[in-house]
């Protein structure tokens, strides 16, 4: 019998906190064979990422402490190897894709410079050959007009495009083992399918092992040969994928398999006047060229979107990465310039200047996809949630603000006693609740939710959806829900707009669009979900 490519043997990892060591991974044993995929599954905080980061000793020590066990690659210990040995393995033989692309991409450098650095360091390639390889790899991961996009900076790409660039960067080294930590979380279903197909193709081509960390069980069904399920730092089940998915033995695994979003949107209040009316919304960014950076053309990213939204109603914006979903949200918030009419509660917003918009701002709030980016790590929860009150209700005393913060924390399911903690001390689901509380404290009429559940595991996702529905019924909130997860959209939204490259492909009542889609692109999205 051939030895495994990667063997994790009885690994235990903890974090030192003052005089104590808190264990986070407890006696984990896993194997990844060449040419096979092991899916590591579990909810937020289960120890998946700590296990993955330990393979290349990427955890800072201290505070991380390796308590017992070993990690072997081709039979050789990585855990106890010299730093020089590990440096030779990192990138060359074992590559890693992280969940948040902005952590891995340098905002100050173009894509070409960052990709070229990988090829020159790890494969010794130079100018023209390296450029051809870069363009080919970007094409393979679905970046349109790859040769032109090489000049772009990370901030000029959509979230999904940044994720694809990061995957391309890891694959350029042609590694023997690829560790992928939630690499498709931010991607729409069509791009997700494309990336999974690419990973399978590269596995066959390179006989590459793949450790795939995810909370998305539909991906596990499509990709994994074996599955290990983690809970509270322990591996509770480890079997071949077909066996585990058809006949799970552990109650936690059974719970995960039954946690897909279900249910219907909340009932609509009758006889409501429109809260938001949007007519022919259009967003175009200038294309500048030459030394003087003169505008030579415009790139239309959102074109001719119209809809009406009532109190207590949810509109879903669906489409692949770069389709204009988030840009539409930014335009409605008046954070970027747009054309067309935006009427909020009878008042036209498109003619108001910044000062005139201020009284309206507290009534339109936003919750972003990644709470790690949207919550200031230097502020505690009390300071984060009360920030809007300081701007919009400056006459409130500190005690009054704190009382409101405690009340809204209870409303979103957070313990008010934790208000003096910092974001890093909370799980992903708890951080998203903090973001919802920050929006809710200003008593808005409309909340724009930009992929608020895509980075959360299924069990936490279900809890956040239940919270959003409860708040919607209680406060008659209107939502604009931006998502690529069609299961979530169907469970929450009353009407839906399907976008592709800034154009409306299909629009209508959610149930009608899902049960009888009229357009081929909508049918394709539904088939892939």
PLM regions and their residue ranges:
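Conserved ABC ATPase signature
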Residues: 152-157, 161, 422-426, 430
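Conserved ABC ATPase "signature" region
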Residues: 129-148, 399-417
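Conserved ABC transporter NBD signature motif
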Residues: 66-77, 340-349, 360
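ABC ATPase NBD coupling module
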Residues: 64, 78-95, 113, 121, ...
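ABC ATPase "signature
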Residues: 235-239, 247, 504-508
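A short, proline-enriched helix->beta-strand linker immediately N-terminal to the Walker B motif
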Residues: 172-176, 441-445
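A short, surface-exposed alpha-helical micro-motif characterized by mixed small hydrophobic
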Residues: 220-222, 489-491
């Amino acid at each position: 019998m051939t030895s495994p490519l990667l063997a994790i043997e009885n690994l235990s990892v903890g974090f030192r906190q003052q005089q104590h060591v808190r264990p986070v991974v407890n006696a984990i044993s896993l194997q990844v064979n060449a040419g096979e995929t092991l899916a590591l599954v579990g909810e937020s905080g289960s120890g998946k990422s700590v296990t993955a980061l330990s393979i290349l000793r990427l955890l800072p020590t201290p505070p991380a402490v390796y308590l017992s066990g070993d990690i072997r690659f081709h039979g050789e210990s990585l855990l106890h190897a010299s730093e020089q040995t590990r440096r030779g393995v990192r990138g060359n033989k074992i590559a890693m894709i992280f969940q948040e692309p902005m952590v891995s991409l340098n905002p100050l450098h173009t894509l070409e410079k960052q990709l070229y650095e990988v090829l020159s360091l790890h494969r010794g390639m130079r100018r023209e050959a390296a450029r051809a390889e870069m363009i080919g790899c970007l094409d393979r991961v679905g970046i349109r007009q790859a040769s032109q996009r090489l000049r772009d900076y990370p901030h000029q790409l959509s979230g999904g495009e940044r994720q694809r660039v990061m995957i391309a960067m890891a694959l350029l080294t042609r590694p023997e083992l690829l560790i992928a930590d939630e690499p498709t979380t931010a991607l729409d279903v069509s791009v997700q399918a494309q990336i999974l197909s690419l990973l399978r193709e590269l596995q066959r081509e390179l006989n590459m092992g793949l450790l795939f960390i995810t909370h998305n069980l539909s991906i596990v069904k499509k990709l994994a040969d074996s599955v290990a399920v983690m809970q509270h730092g322990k591996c509770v089940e480890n079997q071949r994928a077909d066996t585990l998915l058809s006949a799970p033995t552990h109650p936690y695994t059974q719970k995960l398999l039954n946690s897909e979003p279900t249910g219907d949107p909340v009932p609509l209040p009758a006889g409501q006047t429109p809260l938001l009316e949007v007519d022919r919304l259009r967003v175009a960014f200038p294309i500048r060229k030459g030394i003087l950076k003169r505008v030579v053309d415009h790139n239309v990213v959102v074109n001719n979107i119209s809809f009406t939204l009532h109190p207590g109603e949810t509109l879903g914006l669906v489409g692949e990465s770069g389709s204009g979903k988030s840009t539409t949200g930014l335009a409605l918030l008046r954070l970027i310039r747009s054309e067309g009419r935006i009427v909020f509660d009878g008042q036209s917003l498109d003619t108001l200047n910044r000062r005139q918009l201020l009284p309206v701002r507290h009534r339109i709030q936003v919750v972003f996809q990644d709470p790690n980016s949207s919550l200031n790590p230097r502020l505690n929860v009390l300071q984060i949630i009360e920030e809007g009150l300081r701007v919009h209700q400056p006459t409130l005393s500190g005690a009054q603000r704190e009382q409101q913060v405690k009340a809204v924390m209870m409303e979103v399911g957070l313990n008010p006693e934790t208000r003096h903690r910092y974001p890093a001390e909370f799980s992903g689901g708890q951080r998203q609740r903090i973001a919802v509380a920050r929006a809710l404290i200003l008593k808005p009429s409309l909340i724009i939710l930009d992929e608020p559940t895509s980075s959360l595991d299924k069990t936490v996702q279900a809890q956040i959806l239940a919270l959003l529905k409860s708040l919607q019924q209680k406060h008659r909130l209107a939502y604009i829900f931006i998502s690529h997860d069609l299961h979530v959209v169907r469970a929450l939204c009353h009407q839906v707009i399907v976008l592709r490259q800034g154009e409306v492909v299909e629009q209508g009542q959610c149930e009608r669009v899902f049960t009888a889609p009229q357009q081929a692109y909508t049918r394709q999205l539904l088939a892939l979900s």
